Amino acid sequence: SQNPYANAFTDVKDFVFFDTDWQDILWGTTASTSHELSVAGGTDRNTYRLSARYMYDGSNLKWGNNNNQRYNLRLSNTFHVTDAFEIESVIAYSRQDQVAPTQIGAALTSSVQQPGFPSSTIDGKPYAWGTWGAPNWYCELGGDNKLKVSGVNISETFKYKFNKHFDAVAT
């Protein structure tokens, strides 16, 4: 558009005021889901429970890749070796995959944008004026931080019942 102030801001080619709602531009709705499946069974001397879980947590941030996924697998066993001696075994595995925009800090901790500052050019490309950049594009084009964490936990418990008032437990 043409500059409405002919003798001022002569270096600014796009001098219009937009009704820019940064909350609406940056944030939206998302979905989270969690699924679990377990199987249990056994006999008088041996019981088990196997469970698996998947969780996906999306992000309200509309720009860039931002989500969290978690996988869990767990096996619990109880072996009654004798009437007085019991072994409990728990083996658990978990994995977390998290993705966040590399420049999310620059986008979310930036000062409030200038009044009328557009989020993009008229043809949908990133917009910047001097050192002011549209924060949505920092998230969209700044790359991804990927965090992958896996863990295994093994727990064994040995119980011996001497009498109805006294047990010995070792883990």
Task: For every predicted segment, state its role.
Residues 1, 32-34, 47, 53:
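A beta-strand signature from Gram-negative outer-membrane beta-barrel systems
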